[in-house]
Every structure is written in structure tokens, then in C-alpha cells.
Amino acid sequence: MAEGGAEGKAKRVLVAIDESESSHYALEWVLANLRSSLSSSPLVVFTVQPYSEISYLNAASFGAPPMELIQTVQQHHKELSLSLLEKAKEICIQHGVVAETISEVGDPKEAICEAVEKLKIDLLVVGSHGKGAIQRVFLGSVSNYCMHNAKCPVLVVKKSV
């Protein structure tokens, strides 16, 4: 996978992570199983800061939430994302893999697929959260959305029980 056909183009792999155990496992899986493929191109580790979800405060106060509260929530999401990426980068270094880290703000499903296209990713790797069928219907599934909408092959890594 490191060299692509006649062009000799390095393949780009993106691992989408969040704070879940399943995304951490997906990163570890890539580092253990695709390490030789990552020697000619940095691994892209990607996380998404969700939009601030403080709409419940609107109902309680019958107005807009204070700007300070919005900024505090946004700052918390930013710090969490940066911490996740820093830990992921350290794990990559321990495996001898160069990583490029990127954080975006938005809906995770859409942001991941947009990043795949923008960064010309050749393989997207996501973890499986193991939601049941009912949860997937009501909550949606990032991995399912990416499988149907990403402009590259998608590998869903599920931790064996």
C-alpha cells in the first residue's frame, strides 16, 4: 500500500478519533497492522470538535445562552481535541510512525468525509462503537455514514470481544 501503481504515489491514511475506547483501538490497530504502509507518508490523525450543544439552556432560560458560557464550552471542546491529538501523536511516535494531526469543528460524520476529500485520503479508518440496531437508527453511526459517503475505502475496526 505504500507505493501506488505506476505513479509510485504514497498512500494517505486517515484515522478518525474521539475520546472512545473504540477509536483508540482503531489507532493502535492501524499502527500494528499497517505500519509498513505508513513509512512513505504521514498518518493523518483527525478529530472533530462538535458544535456546542447547549440548546437545553435555551429552553430553560427562554433566551440565548450567555456568550461566556458558549465560549467556555467551545474552549473545553478545543482543549479536549488538542489533548486527544497530543496523546495520539505520542502513541504514533512510540510506534515509529510520523503523524499529522488535524482538528476541525462541526458534525463528525460530515467533517470526516470532507477531510477525506480535501486531504486526498486513500484509506479512512474508524472505530466501531458497537451500537445496537436501535441506537444506530436514532443516533446514527459515524462509521456507517462514512462507509456510504467517504470518497475512499473505509476500514471499520471493531475490537474483538
For the regions a protein language model found, what residue spans apply to each?
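Small-residue (primarily alanine) positions within well-ordered alpha-helices
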Residues: S23-A26, V116, S143, A150
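Short, flexible loop segments at boundaries between secondary-structure elements
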Residues: C152-V161
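Structural beta-alpha unit
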Residues: M1-K9, A64, Q75, E79, ...
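Generic structural signal for helix capping and beta-alpha/helix-loop junctions
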Residues: S52-E53, K109-A111, A133
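Small/aliphatic-rich secondary-structure junction motif
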Residues: A2-E68, Q75, E90-E100
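Glycine-rich, Arg-bearing micro-motifs that act as flexible, cationic patches
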Residues: R12, L123-H148
